[in-house]
């Protein structure tokens, strides 16, 4: 689909190609009422061509990209008047809050944003019940991305600073949505999945999160950059417990299609149906996973491969191509730093993640003898990489389509001086 390298910008010409079939489109075709709240970040395009309402969502309330992709030095992140930390991106329009294709505010009042998203979620679920329809809600909160923000009820309450306050509000939002599901009497009919997209941005230090015992963070193919928690809740269907089966966000679409009885598009997908794992009827069909860097190419292919408990790194490099993207700087491990060069490893770095999730002990070096099992695992990982790279076809890069400043969303079209004139700020509510 060409969603590489890096990420889309407010003025990007590219976006998620419309010929790609989304999960929302699959479920909408089966009668689901679909809605999305939060961060989109899959492109805007001319007249909003790539926005959620053109990708299978009946309703959308959110910011079309990351909330740091706009000037934020004059914005309030914590009430009553604590400004956002840092200046974010300059020389572009303030971040817009969209309701479907219309600008609700530019910029929005960030301390009140999560509450608006929760209200949107409640309304979607209530309307679906009133229409006797199933619903699909994609809730992509901005928490705990930099710059952190939170509402009045959470500011200064966590004891963990801005990051903790942001996380506390996210926790409350999830709780409010779950309460709404229960109030509608839908707990036994609703599958809830909670997960995240990448590891901590350790360059932000206390404002970026912590990867704990995992190595490095966002922007790397080490576990600190790619391993995320995942929770699934469905009373009467999913028994409480913990699984160590291998899973990926790529598996969500085939899994939800199977559970909802909907048909998948006739294309090759990288995901697997994980319903046997969720329902306790079998093991994960996913036996391996492949990790690309942020700036992939067809020559090197995937940087790392996992099969079962073993993971091999064939190449390592921090994300350094764009300015300010040294996401894992400030850690003591030099392999995480922006100054870390692209390194081809021959033999590859090999780790047993069941015993060493921190990727500290390379099984192919040191004083201990390399066992036959380890050698077999290494050969298997090399074979998997060769087969995967040979089969992969890179689509045309959407990011390489470049940028057009006129595509930036402005609540006052053709105003001057552009882009600072694009201001339709949301008023601060009383008492906040």
How should these model regions be labeled?
Residues 1-35, 46-47, 52-59, 69, ...:
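Active-site segment of extracytoplasmic enzymes that catalyze sulfate/phosphate-ester chemistry
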Residues 9-17, 104-111, 160-164, 217-219, ...:
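Active-site rim elements
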Residues 252, 307, 312, 317-320, ...:
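Long, internal low-complexity/basic segments
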Residues 16-46, 70, 76-79, 83-133:
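Active-site-proximal alpha/beta segments of enzymes that process anionic O-linked groups
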Residues 29-35, 55-58, 130-137, 186-192, ...:
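Loop/turn elements at helix/coil->beta-strand transitions in domains of secreted/extracellular proteins
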Residues 48-56, 147-150, 155-166, 172, ...:
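Histidine-centered active-site microenvironments of extracellular/periplasmic hydrolases
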Residues 58-59, 63-71, 81-82, 200-221, ...:
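C-terminal cap/loop subdomain of S1 sulfatases and analogous C-terminal strand-loop tails that border
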Residues 75, 101-102, 121-165, 201, ...:
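Active-site His/acidic residue clusters
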């Amino acid at each position: 689909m060409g969603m590489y390298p890096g990420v889309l910008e407010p003025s990007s010409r590219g976006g998620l190609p419309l010929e790609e079939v989304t999960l929302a489109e699959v479920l909408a075709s089966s009668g689901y009422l679909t809605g999305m709240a939060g961060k989109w970040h899959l492109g805007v395009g001319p007249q909003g061509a790539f926005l959620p309402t053109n990708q299978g969502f009946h309703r959308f309330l959110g910011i079309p990209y990351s909330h740091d992709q706009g000037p934020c030095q004059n914005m309030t992140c914590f009430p009553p008047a604590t400004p956002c930390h840092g200046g974010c991106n300059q020389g572009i329009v303030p971040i817009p809050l969209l309701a479907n294709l219309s600008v609700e505010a530019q910029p929005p009042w960030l301390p009140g944003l999560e509450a608006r998203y929760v209200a949107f979620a409640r309304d979607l679920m209530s309307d679906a019940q009133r229409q006797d329809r199933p619903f699909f809600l994609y809730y992509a909160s901005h928490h705990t991305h930099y710059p952190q923000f939170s509402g009045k009820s959470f500011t200064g309450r966590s004891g963990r600073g801005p990051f903790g306050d942001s996380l506390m509000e996210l926790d409350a939002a999830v709780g409010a949505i779950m309460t709404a599901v229960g109030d509608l009497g839908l707990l036994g009919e609703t599958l809830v999945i909670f997960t995240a997209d990448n590891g901590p941005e350790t360059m932000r230090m206390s404002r970026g999160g912590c990867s704990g015992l995992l190595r490095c963070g966002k922007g790397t193919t080490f576990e600190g950059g790619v391993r995320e928690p995942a929770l699934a809740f469905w009373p009467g269907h999913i028994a409480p417990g913990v699984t160590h089966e291998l899973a990926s966000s790529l598996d969500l679409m085939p899994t939800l299609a199977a559970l909802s009885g909907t048909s998948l598009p006739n294309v090759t997908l990288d995901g697997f149906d994980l319903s046997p794992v969720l329902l306790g009827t079998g093991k994960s069909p996913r036996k391996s996973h492949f990790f690309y860097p942020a700036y992939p190419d067809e020559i090197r292919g995937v940087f790392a491969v996992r099969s079962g408990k073993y993971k091999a790194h064939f190449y390592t490099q921090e994300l350094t191509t764009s300015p300010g993207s040294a996401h894992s700087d400030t850690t003591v491990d030099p392999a995480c730093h922006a100054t870390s060069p692209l390194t081809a490893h021959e033999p590859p770095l090999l780790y047993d993640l069941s015993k060493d999730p921190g990727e500290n002990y390379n099984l192919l070096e040191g004083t201990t003898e390399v066992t036959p099992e380890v050698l077999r695992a290494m050969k298997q990982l090399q074979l998997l990489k060769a087969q995967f790279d040979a089969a992969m076809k890179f689509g045309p890069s959407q990011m390489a389509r470049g940028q057009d400043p006129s595509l930036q969303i402005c609540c006052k079209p053709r105003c001057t001086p552009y882009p600072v004139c694009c201001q339709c700020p949301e008023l601060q509510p009383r008492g906040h």
